Amino acid sequence: MNKVNQASLTAPLAVPAFRSLWSASIVSNIGAMMQAVGAAWLMTSLTESTLLVGLVQTAATMPVFLVGLVGGAMADLADRKKLLFWSQVWMLVMAALLGILTLGHFTTPAVLLGLTFAIGLGRAIGLPAWQASVQDIVPKPLVASAVSLNSIAFNAARAVGPALGGLLVAATGAAFAFFANAASFLAVLFAVNAWKPEKAPAPRLGEDIFGAIRSGFRYLLHAPRLQAPIIRATMFGLCAAAVWSLLPLLARDVLHTNATGYGVLLGAFGAGSIVAGTFLPRLRNRFALEGILALGTALAAVAFFALSFCRQPWPAGVSLFFAGMAWVGVLVNFNVAVQTSVPDWVRGRALAFYLLAFQGALAISGALWGWLAGVIGISQSFAVAAVGLILSLAFSKFFPLESDEEIDLSPSPAWPELHADLVADPDDGPVLVTIIYDIAEEDASNFRALMRIMRERRLRDGARRWRLYHDAKDPERFLELFRLDSWGEHLLQHQRTTMEDRELEAKVLSLHRGKERPLATHYFGDDE
């Protein structure tokens, strides 16, 4: 990917809607961190079971796996502003209810886990809508800086929130940490309510949630440009997430520090994350994206190697500072790559796939690195993770990130009407579409190459099967054939067309020798 002039880090803050939503997200993220501290501490006072204490974190994160894709589909089908608003209302009510029950001493382990899970549901539904809304709020040139600012907001909250939560719980009890979290959602509600989208949500033909999830999977299967950042972020996460599993063990058993020292080490990681976020726009102006990703991955590997030799807290803190820089430097760019590689109609689902894959990598790595530390040792496990990070660089060869600077993924103007006189129900089907091309022999090779790309586009946007044929008697006559489940799916296929797709169509048509457009015919399945 070529380097391109990027907006400064603070440029998105000049957009009033983004500025207010970003500020509100800081408040909300701090509230979420305080909630996590309060829930974990309350569970330790309700039970001596280490399993139940561990299940608090599971209850908070499991909704991403269960309904994350539903949230992504809803972000694409529904009004994102309304979805954001009502997901915040849901979380506010659940957090306030938990605070009230705790204040009245009615909270049991089951109640705590249930309401923690309920709050997680709201987050799993709202997060894809929030991330997909970035391009609805700021122009495309500001997206990378906006994502960097969101990362800074999260890491700043992660650095401050647990400390504030601990102080509040110690002073007033866990109930008030839950009330603080509930109050933090008010900031987001006010910001969302004040946001006036410049353009109304694009009208979408009827599609249910499960149909949208299926079409999202189909898009992912036939979109290498989306697969690449998801696969590479997953591989990076499997190795880099070793820090979350191994750091508590390193602090306790190798550095021999206490909880305060562990908090300082986490703070060093968070500080590095914030610093990296401020420098990313400058790096993007100077280096190509692949270069930044390679630099960040190598920096993480060096930091992990250093941690494998650390026996004192201060050098470990320095190493974690650079590890935090690498973490944000790599993941922000993968997030930007996902957001800018897909059109608006599927962006929520694309981000849901990304979040699901990355969270899955974190979950797997937790067990993997914990097990490995018990087998070969903590320091040695950091060294293995460093080697894994270096090896993960090889994935850039097999899954390169394509340049998005010249790609126009905006919706295409409407195609020519599909048989305006045809009376068909959206559920009618299956539908078979045939298109006949007249291609000169000397252009056949170029035509076939373009049609291989066309195949992926057709399958990605709704077709079930696709095939290209040539006439046995007239080798310059080609037949494109693809099948869809219903007439409604074919209408959706047209609605999903982007300007990039139209450019491909124009290249194909330039090889067609006929004076008229290639003849397209639509057939409906007939069981009689």
Put a short name on every predicted segment.
Residues 4-62, 218, 222-267:
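Helix-loop boundary and gating motifs at the non-cytosolic
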Residues 14, 45, 76-77, 105, ...:
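Membrane-helix boundary and inter-helical linker elements of multi-pass secondary transporters
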Residues 17-37, 60-94, 111-170, 185, ...:
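Substrate-agnostic recognition of the 12-TM MFS/MFS-like secondary transporter fold
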Residues 40-47, 98-104, 160-180, 253-255, ...:
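Transmembrane alpha-helix termini and helix-breaking/packing motifs in multi-pass membrane transporters
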Residues 66, 81-83, 97, 109, ...:
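C-terminal transmembrane bundle of multi-pass solute transporters/carriers
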Residues 132, 136, 178-208, 286, ...:
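Helix-loop junctions on the cytosolic side of multi-pass membrane transporters
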Residues 402-405, 458-465, 483-519:
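An amphipathic, aromatic/His-enriched active-site/gating alpha helix that lines ligand/cofactor pockets
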Residues 455-479:
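Short, glycine- and small/hydrophobic-rich beta-strand elements in well-ordered beta-sheets
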